Amino acid sequence: MERLAPAKVNLGLSVRFRREDGYHELHTLFAPFSLADRLVVEPVSSGLHFQGPYGRENLAYRAASLYLEAAGQPGGVRILLEKRIPEGAGLGGGSSDAAQVLLALQALYPAEVDLFALARTLGADVPFFLLGRGAEARGVGERLKPLALPPVPAVVFFPGLRVPTPLVYRAVRPEDFGPDLPVEAILEALARGEEPPYWNSLEGPAFRLFPELKEVRGRMRALGLRGVLMSGSGSAFFGLAEGPDHARRAAEALRAWGRAWAGTLGGGDAGSGPA
């Protein structure tokens, strides 16, 4: 069984406040992006055989182990993971891989297992990737409301800098906190091809830690991309294009400074098809 594990971008991310448990309350819009890792998941008689980076420490391996245990060890599995989504980019690659493993194993070994409960133990972004579509998220990202997002041509750019998510959150200051995102206004702007009124509260701390990230927005805007924003805790940025050709030209130009992909964000189901 082959599955695609799509990347995500945050169409705005507002850090509302720091909670008593030490985590930050968030309000964000998740959108799948067409860049994807590739997974091959096959049943075997016994054991958990994983071929991919980090071995047993990989979130996809941990997801498989959790599911097989919860399902009563119905059989074994062999997993091949081909990484395309860069690490430390804020694109959710590891979380997406884990979600697709859970979905694949449920298809191979059906059982009364709460996938969302397992996903929450693996990471805050994993439940979103089970949905396979856009979503509004609150809490630390685990409280989800599905959203219908229009497909938008876009470019994702990774400058090659790995940014540890915990480091960015530790650098958040009270002045970085923001109000709820204007969800309806963002959706309307996307549908009309206009600049969405979103922001990312994590840009401030990320820019303080890594000042070189400030240059990225200017480079992308100079290529005619609109709504340029850092995704998650960085270091990847995305920008909205006028059309597929514009996206391809912009991505080609950006490859002089890092890795770039032209594709589509939002739209219909993501992650369910073959590679």
UniProtKB/Swiss-Prot annotation:
Active-site residues per Swiss-Prot or TrEMBL entry: 8, 125
The keyword ATP-binding is annotated on this UniProt entry: yes
Keywords: ATP-binding, Isoprene biosynthesis, Kinase, Nucleotide-binding, Transferase
Broadest EC class assigned to this enzyme: transferase
Gene: ispE
SUPFAM superfamilies linked to this entry: GHMP Kinase, C-terminal domain, Ribosomal protein S5 domain 2-like
Protein name, entry field: 4-diphosphocytidyl-2-C-methyl-D-erythritol kinase
Transcription as UniProt keyword: no
Pathway: Isoprenoid biosynthesis; isopentenyl diphosphate biosynthesis via DXP pathway; isopentenyl diphosphate from 1-deoxy-D-xylulose 5-phosphate: step 3/6
Gene3D superfamilies referenced in this protein's UniProt entry, alphabetically: 3.30.230.10, GHMP kinase, C-terminal domain (3.30.70.890)
A Pfam family: GHMP_kinases_N
Sites where the protein binds ATP: 86-96
Species for this entry: Thermus thermophilus (strain ATCC 27634 / DSM 579 / HB8)
Catalysed reactions, semicolon-separated: 4-CDP-2-C-methyl-D-erythritol + ATP = 4-CDP-2-C-methyl-D-erythritol 2-phosphate + ADP + H(+)
Function: Catalyzes the phosphorylation of the position 2 hydroxy group of 4-diphosphocytidyl-2C-methyl-D-erythritol.
One of the GO biological process terms: isopentenyl diphosphate biosynthetic process, methylerythritol 4-phosphate pathway
GO molecular function, a single term: ATP binding
Enzyme Commission number(s) of this protein: 2.7.1.148
Similarity comment: family membership: Belongs to the GHMP kinase family. IspE subfamily.
